[in-house]
Amino acid sequence: MAEERKKLFVDALRKKFKEEPKERKTTFYTLGGWKQSERKKEFVEYGKKVAKERGIPAYNPDIGTPLGQRVLMPYQVSTTDTFVEGDDLHFVNNLAMQQFWDDIRRTVIVGLNHAHRILERSLGKEVTPETINHYLETVNHAMPGAAVVQEHMVETHPGLTADSYVKVFTGNDELADEIESCYLIDINKQFPEHQAEQLKKAIGHTIWQAVRIPTIVSRTCDGATTSRWSAMQIGMSMISAYKQAAGEAATADFAYAAKHAEVIHLGTFLPVRRARGENELGGVPFGFLADIVQSSRVHYEDPVRVALDVVASGAMLYDQIWLGSYMSGGVGFTQYATASYTDNILDDFTYYGKEYVEDKYGGLAEAPHDFDTILDVATEVTLYSLDQYEEYPTLMEDHFGGSQRAAIAAAASGCSTAFAAGNAQAGLSGWYLSQILHKECHARLGFYGYDLQDQCGAANTYSIRSDEGLPAELRGPNYPNYAMNVGHLGEYAGIVQAAHIARGDADSLNPLVKVAFADDNLPFDWTNPRGEFAKGALREFEPEGERDLIRPAGK
């Protein structure tokens, strides 16, 4: 089958290196150094300007290792025709990547069900679609930082907080029909019918708020601020909309409901040694990330696209921002991430695996749940992947680090195994097996300790104990063995998504999270993360949370 397929990465390699991908001889030191990069030339000019203005030397690529001894590679963002410079895929230089994380950190999901019970049972108030709509009008005034109950309160400028709002969703079609459309995330409109039915059944007659606090607030403070900011404005809006006395005992019940009882944080609290609160990156489980990304409701007939959109999202979020900056403070982690979402390489390997699974087992999620399936699929895809690196020297240069190659071969193997079994734990086993096979073939994978979690992971894939094993959907960067090994976390999230899209599931872990991000008012297009990263690299992405309104005039 391998000989009959058109390799998806060949065109990208040809354009990157301007030589035939199978060519085994090349040249060095003749490409112009850093001047071959338009972005580096721009950096140099800005570095001179900064140094002149501040009186302290700034960017100078002639310091340190000479850049550009070989091709300073451009990258084709997979699923797009866009080639970009590597520097533009660093999250500091990419507004789309920043907004990706902003949109997660500033979101909290809060139920209205407990609050409605308090209103009806404790206060004797009537809750109707009309009162819910009135409350939603009130809370959309208040959530950006406006006053509703107290006088002489300072307020935020709506031009600075225009990205802050509240919408609701429910599995009850009759109730949804009564909610004003501007406040509603309509499950029937946003999801294909088979997914909408699953989600509505799971959510039932409950009603939930998708709260977006202002980007500028979560950036200035932290993720743990999100639920507190949300709860304060929700509480004040409830008092105003339902004409309560602010000091009565039920106010405490509303505060508890809005802060604790029906609150879904998108990130869990981290241990003291990592010192982060809720809604911070290290606490975002893989299953939540798979649900946040919305590719599955648009591209559900292309399971590889769906799984790899999650891989790309996780590689950027977990590798570039969490491990690359929160945890290590480094710059080079970007290259680990780009390997998984550029040049159609992982796409090629994973489509090969999917086709193999379909040919061998007659479809996705049809293979037996046993070790023979894991051994078969992971071995086949790993050997195919390693063969490509041997056959195409430019592919080897593209993924110049052994740990990059290990991550990509294992990601394709893990996703393919998850496709076969429809089970994320099986996919994890496929990943671990691929790493061990790869090390057997090449003697090493990458930098020292890269495969630490892979060597011990096989022993606890099916051990469901608090610090040794969890269902893959519930694992995340906070899982002990995954604390500091780059080139793993995003791929694990993709393996989770691969299992659930193979089964035809509408969500991977939490239907509330899936629906909360099916929201067209969000600035980031969650159905197309790789396309958005490309827009950010081209400087075509429009972010939220900007401060131009309060800058000095003329600046």
From Swiss-Prot:
Its main location: cytoplasm. Coenzyme M binds at Y336, Y448. Pathway: One-carbon metabolism; methyl-coenzyme M reduction; methane from methyl-coenzyme M: step 1/1. It is an enzyme of class 2 (transferase). Its cofactor is coenzyme F430. Coenzyme F430 binds at Q150. It holds the Pfam family MCR_alpha_N. InterPro entries: Me_CoM_Rdtase_asu (IPR016212), Me_CoM_Rdtase_asu/bsu_C (IPR008924), Me_CoM_Rdtase_asu_C (IPR009047), Me_CoM_Rdtase_asu_N (IPR003183), Me_CoM_Rdtase_asu_N_sub1 (IPR015811), Me_CoM_Rdtase_asu_N_sub2 (IPR015823), Me_CoM_Rdtase_Fd-like_fold (IPR009024). Keywords: Cytoplasm, Metal-binding, Methanogenesis, Methylation, Nickel, Transferase. One of its GO terms (molecular function) is metal ion binding. Binds 2 coenzyme F430 non-covalently per MCR complex. Coenzyme F430 is a yellow nickel porphinoid. Methyl-coenzyme-M reductase is activated when the enzyme-bound coenzyme F430 is reduced to the Ni(I) oxidation state. GO terms for biological process: methanogenesis. It is found in: Cytoplasm. Gene3D superfamilies: 3.30.70.470, Methyl-coenzyme M reductase, alpha/beta subunit, C-terminal, Methyl-coenzyme M Reductase, Chain A, domain 1. Transmembrane segments: none annotated. Its EC number is 2.8.4.1. It catalyses: coenzyme B + methyl-coenzyme M = methane + coenzyme M-coenzyme B heterodisulfide. One of its GO terms (cellular component) is cytoplasm. Coenzyme B binds at R228, K259, H260, R273. Belongs to the methyl-coenzyme M reductase alpha subunit family. MCR is a hexamer of two alpha, two beta, and two gamma chains, forming a dimer of heterotrimers. Component of the methyl-coenzyme M reductase (MCR) I that catalyzes the reductive cleavage of methyl-coenzyme M (CoM-S-CH3 or 2-(methylthio)ethanesulfonate) using coenzyme B (CoB or 7-mercaptoheptanoylthreonine phosphate) as reductant which results in the production of methane and the mixed heterodisulfide of CoB and CoM (CoM-S-S-CoB). This is the final step in methanogenesis. This is Methyl-coenzyme M reductase subunit alpha. It comes from Methanothermus fervidus. The gene is mcrA.
